[in-house]
Design a protein with these regions (language model features):
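Von Willebrand factor A/integrin I-like adhesion domains
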Residues: 147-204, 208, 227, 233
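VWA/integrin I-like adhesion module and closely mimicked acidic/polar interface patches used
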Residues: 99, 117-157
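Alpha-helix termini
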Residues: 35-42, 93-103, 133-134, 187
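Short, well-ordered amphipathic alpha-helices
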Residues: 28-36, 87-97, 126-130
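Von Willebrand factor
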Residues: 1-60, 67-107, 110-114, 139-153, ...
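Short glycine-/polar-rich loops that comprise or flank the Walker A/P-loop
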Residues: 3-4, 107-108, 136-139, 158-159
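An acidic, Ser/Thr-enriched
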Residues: 236-258
């Protein structure tokens, strides 16, 4: 039976600490519950989870939906998107069956790469390799979490780059529902033959916006600072996440909100 491999490639760097990581953890469970109600997805979709920070790691290898158990997302330092792409390409080579003269292989993998930051490694070699060897072998969808995710590197290798403008709990739920609907749509479309391109569900523009240009893809977050340290007593690493707070300045003559 031909499978539809689905890879979730998730940024678990320090900037994801807190609500974002917790929402993605809950989102994976929500995704599986929804897909298990779709007979088309149950028949064809196989899911894998790859987490990356400074280094990538496969948390769950490709497995059918009925046997999938949501992994616990770790937390790390760094945002090595280039290394994550190299790891993803290795997973595709090892686990996705290619067509031969004797039999057809798996359908084109569907990849959802999610990040809230800018790559901390050199992506150029991975970008070139993806465009040369994998752009026609897999459908990559890149999602920026929050208004400050720098997606210019990914927009050069995929026409499907989107941004979640406000990473609220409800927005994450709607985003996960969109991922689920996209997997279901792709599962249904391959029933009549392999589609020439990815078939995604309609984007809810109140939650996500498609990136149309390199200028839209670049952003810098000046409201957060992440500091890493090591406990002198326990010798364990820790993270401190600071958010710029707004303050109200008021005198007898005027009132203004400042940062």
């Amino acid at each position: 039976m031909r499978r539809l491999p689905v890879f979730l490639v998730i940024d678990v760097s320090e900037s994801m600490a807190g609500d974002n990581l917790r929402s993605l953890q809950d989102g994976i469970e929500r995704l599986i519950r929804t897909l298990r109600t779709d007979p088309y997805a149950l028949e064809t979709a196989y899911l894998s989870v790859i987490a990356f920070a400074g280094r990538p790691k496969t948390l769950t290898p490709l497995v059918e939906l009925v046997a999938f158990y949501p992994p616990r997302l770790p937390l790390g330092s760094g945002t090595s998107i280039g290394a994550a792409l190299e790891h993803l390409m290795g997973e595709i080579d090892r686990n996705v069956k290619r067509s031969t003269p004797e039999q057809k292989g798996d359908f084109k993998p569907l990849v959802f790469l999610m990040t809230d930051g800018k790559s901390t490694d050199d992506m150029s070699a991975a970008q070139a390799r993806w465009k040369r060897d994998y752009a026609n072998r897999a459908n990559l969808v890149a999602i920026g979490i929050g208004p400050y995710a720098a997606l210019e590197g990914l927009s050069s290798i995929s026409p499907n780059v989107l941004r979640i403008e406000n990473a609220t709990e409800q927005d994450f739920k709607k985003f996960i529902d969109w991922v689920s609907a996209s997997v279901s749509t792709q599962s249904r479309s391959i029933g009549t033959g392999e589609p020439p391109k990815v078939n995604l569900a309609k984007v809810d523009e109140s939650v996500m916006k498609k990136i149309e240009s390199i200028a839209q893809a670049a952003a810098v977050d000046e409201d957060f600072v992440i500091v890493s340290g090591k406990c002198q007593t326990l010798k364990l690493p820790y993270l401190l996440k600071y958010e710029r707070a707004k303050h109200a300045v008021e005198t007898s003559d005027f009132r203004v909100d400042t940062t």
